[in-house]
Amino acid sequence: METKRVLLLLSFAIVLSISLGDEEFANQSHDWKYFVFSQWWPQSQCYYKENADSLADQSFRIVNDYRFRNDCVPTYVENWTIHGLWPTLNGTPHPGWCNDSWKFNESKIEDLKSKMMRQWITLPDSSESELLWKHEWEKHGTCAASLPAVSSEHAYFLQALTLNRQTNLLKMLADKGLSPSDDNMYKVEEFEDAIMKEYGVKGRVICVKERGDDQYTYIGGIRICFNKTFSPIDCLVTEPERCREGEALKYPVIIRA
């Protein structure tokens, strides 16, 4: 009898230990310190598509396929658009998928959709924008929701739209001498310096490369980091992505059909 009792207690202790361990792991995996706010230059998105089956994959490639037109930007899109607002820990966009049961509900953002179709779209095919919103909410928004300011689907998307409007990258860069051009090329560090001059922090430049030798490199995106009160802070990862310091970038003019 005593042996059976000991075995039962031991089994309970093991189960409790595993349970607490899982809970501790879950808490750790959901921890984050700041936001990475990623924005795209829409014209550069016309030149490439995803090289994977998921919107989560960041491996893009230029396509020279007649099915993907370089005049893909809708007439109502004129500024930099949102890629995502990502809770981040130690320089990587983690955690992710923090609540599998909290699915994207488009009706929750019905009043924001007209703004989102101008500020948060997928290119070259804007008809897939709702898939991007779904992905961004379920992967990143459910983790951001631990912060009261963005604790609902509506609040999360509204905050990202607000940051996009406040940063106004098209005007900010133009004020620093960086405007879309068919002729001018800009160095990677000119974009980095513009972020530093405007916000006093280090951001990150994301580039897009054409396939083949001696092809152009485009400015594809800019990432600016914010703390949990949405004040700009230095990003932990600041080296350019898919390009290098000193490299010349095209900042293409939006092509209209």
Give names to the regions the model predicted.
Residues 116-257:
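C-terminal, well-folded lobe of enzymatic/effector domains
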Residues 13-15, 40, 65-66, 92, ...:
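Processing junctions and N-termini across compartments
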Residues 1-3, 257:
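A positional/structural detector of protein chain ends, strongest at the extreme C-terminus
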Residues 23-126:
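Betabetaalpha-Me/HNH-type nuclease active-site subdomain
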Residues 11, 71, 75-76, 224-225:
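Terminal and linker regions of secretory-pathway proteins
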Residues 6-8, 34, 79, 223:
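Beta-sheet entry/capping signal
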